[in-house]
UniProtKB/Swiss-Prot annotation:
The modification Phosphothreonine is found at residue 197. This is Chaperone protein DnaK. It comes from the Bacteria. Induction: By stress conditions e.g. heat shock. Residues 625-636 have a biased composition (Acidic residues). Belongs to the heat shock protein 70 family. PROSITE patterns: HSP70_1, HSP70_2, HSP70_3.
Amino acid sequence: MAGEIAIGIDLGTTNSCVAIKDKVIENAEGARTTPSVVAFTSDGQTLVGAPAQRQAVTNAKNTIVASKRLIGRRFKDNVIKGIQKDYPYKIVEAKNGDAWIEAGGKSYSPSQVGANVLIKLKEAAETYTGKKVTKAVITVPAYFDDAQRTATKDAGRIAGLEVLRIINEPTAAALAYGLDKTATTKNIAVFDLGGGTFDVSILELGDGVFEVKATNGDTHLGGEDFDRMILNFLVEEFKKENGMDLKNDPLALQRLKEAAEKAKKELSSTQETDINLPYITADAAGPKHLNVKFTRAKLESLVSDLIDRTIEPCKKALKDSGLKREEINEVVLVGGMTRMPAVVKKVTEFFGKEPHKGVNPDEVVAIGAAIQANILAGGSDAQDIVLLDVTPLSLGIETLGGVFTKLIDRNTTIPTKRSQTFSTAEDNQSAVTIRVFQGERQMASDNKLLGQFSLGGIPPAPRGMPQIEVTFDIDANGIVHVSAKDKGTGKEQTVKIQASGGLTEEEIKKMVDEAASKADEDKKRRELVEAKNSAESLIHSTEKSLSEYGSKISSSDKQSIDDAISDLKSVLAKDDASLIKEKTDALSKVSMKLGEAMYKESQSASNDSSPKNDSTEEGERVVDPEYEEVKDEDSK
């Protein structure tokens, strides 16, 4: 494994980024970040990033944005109900009860959609290195639960990546920020407000150790919510002026969403902007236009409640870390939303100090992930760093009366392992069912059900006699594993949590195969496009040359070229790259006669315009020059 290339990926709600070591890699469009947008077109293409974003207005129902908000979630989750009305694409219930996406007549898991983004980033890294890339560290919001982390890891597998580690976004940011700052011990707070999620982590840095003391957050708070507040305001303004509700028009909504995001960004550096959308809709009287003057003050009033929501998690994280505000040495801002002046002001007020502004909030997470990837891959230049992260949520089981009994508390350093001994409730009971939950509420039903499993084959015995030791293990990815051992017989059983949702191994394998097949299709499609472009370019240049120099070649050569052009034109519509290349080569070959004629013509023109050295004009007197040889005195 030593010396292998491993990349770091920040798979974001709005934008994603890939890095190697400490360098951010540009994508195929030359941009350092890639929009987390995937579109399925009517002709079977899958577009990712900026190309998908550009066609969103005309293909809104098949253009998937913010799929990270769905990853690892159940369809009946209250969050999903809120999301459905915000996006034009359709969210459907999968067979296992998870929230999936319907587009182009097919259903896709959020992991599949995320995998498309990962593939694009992986390809960018392969183009940059000139080598195949198969290993990665992928970041997730610190407050992601087990199902969301597992689904993110599945996305990596579908994309053909071995996910070396899932790490928390604030931890990755701290790694990038503090790599050269561990000579002295310091406490830092990472405030991460991105496109769809919010996290805050308190860390202690020193002597090459990055130790997370506490983390908190909100997996449903981010830039998308800010955009929605602006969009709703614009809809209401238009309704007041025109009496029409734009929420029933998907095309208008997509244009409004893009305008809202653009205005939000502009108001980070200006006090006022114009939102101008001509022909936003029409009625019997004709087309309607939207033109609104939008100020920073108005924006801040619309989103003040959202900004305030970031403070409670900050308070909880500080409390759990055992530190006071004045003990925080540095505050690091991460995520595009931290460019908003009102957000910076709120953070400054809470922590009592100006945030550190020496990192790029859009890139720092990917860089941190890449640093960790280089360490895990055994890079020769990898620094000796110890990363101690925590589990964001408590892990436990449902006990008598539906009570949630915690086995592992939140903010416990991971990896970690805890064991608990269970027994039977009835005589001769041969099996017990254990339901595993993650969360902080007192009652199990109010927390997130990770799954349940049954321990069978228990020997007949009076109730309370069998001693079944169940071990709960959270790995370095924050993903939960369970094992069990019958202490009476010494027999050990491997128990796999049967999650209530999530992708099965068979589904993942199928999706991996589909992704590989899609990659082959995309390659063939690209080859076809390139072949057609070359053919059309050759036809154009040959026809142009033929019109200018056709008289300089024989009629039979001219006929051969005309025939070759006709042959090539006839196969352009057949979508057969090899046939198009064959006919292109044939035209290129027969048109060589035309090239020879063009060369002779240019040579003739060149000779006609050059000075005539071998003849003189009539009456011109030629005088031989007189000269004297000067000998070099030094050469004797």
